[in-house]
Amino acid sequence: MPYWLPTYNFEGLQCLQCKKALGSLDALKCKNHKYRRVHRGGKPYGMCQICLEALLQLERQEFPWTLLLPKDFVKVLGRLPGDYCVRCYYCGCVLSDSEKDRHALDHEGYLYVRGRARGRCYSCSSDGRRPCVF
């Protein structure tokens, strides 16, 4: 059974980290990447792309991670990759089924960090700017 993530309207929200108002592009990315709004003090917040990528970089560098091979996905997480929400470890978008298939075909592993699997989306892996971290 595929996962389901709700979509929210992020127009007019502030970034949780820098407290700047989200621009229309950041609000659209939050919605398209299926982020969830967070509430602090009863007020909803989103996340701008600059802060999100900085936090994902911090997660890759500061938190211990292990390599999770596609063949071991079910053993570790108990579900197939198609039934699991895997996000990109560079930009945070949800990986599509074809991107998860690319991981399996190319034998590119996932990062298993903080109890979650992270992979690379097509946009972050196609141009070579964002290399595989292992």
Swiss-Prot record:
The answer on whether this UniProt entry bears the keyword Ubl conjugation reads no
Its GO CC terms are: host cell cytoplasm; host cell nucleus
Give GO terms: molecular function aspect only: DNA binding; zinc ion binding
The UniProt keywords, alphabetically, are: Activator, DNA-binding, Early protein, Host cytoplasm, Host nucleus, Host-virus interaction, Inhibition of host innate immune response by virus, Metal-binding, Modulation of host cell apoptosis by virus, Transcription, Transcription regulation, Viral immunoevasion, Zinc, Zinc-finger
Q: What is its main location?
A: host cell
Per UniProt, subcellular location reads as: Host cytoplasm; Host nucleus
Pfam families to which the protein is assigned, alphabetical: E6
What Gene3D superfamilies does UniProt report for this protein, alphabetically?
E6 early regulatory protein
Q: Which domain of life is it from?
A: Viruses
SUPFAM superfamilies membership: E6 C-terminal domain-like
Give any single GO term for biological process.
symbiont-mediated suppression of host innate immune response
Q: Which InterPro entries match?
A: E6, E6_sf
Residues in unnamed zinc fingers run: 15-51, 88-124
Q: Does the keyword Zinc-finger apply?
A: yes
What the protein does comes down to: Plays a major role in the induction and maintenance of cellular transformation. E6 associates with host UBE3A/E6-AP ubiquitin-protein ligase and modulates its activity. Protects host keratinocytes from apoptosis by mediating the degradation of host BAK1. May also inhibit host immune response.
What is the protein's quaternary organization?
Answer: Forms homodimers. Interacts with ubiquitin-protein ligase UBE3A/E6-AP; this interaction stimulates UBE3A ubiquitin activity. Interacts with host BAK1.
Q: Which family does it belong to?
A: Belongs to the papillomaviridae E6 protein family.
Which HAMAP family does this chain map to? HPV_E6 (MF_04006)
Q: Supply the name of the protein.
A: Protein E6
The organism's lineage? Viruses, Monodnaviria, Shotokuvirae, Cossaviricota, Papovaviricetes
The gene it comes from is E6
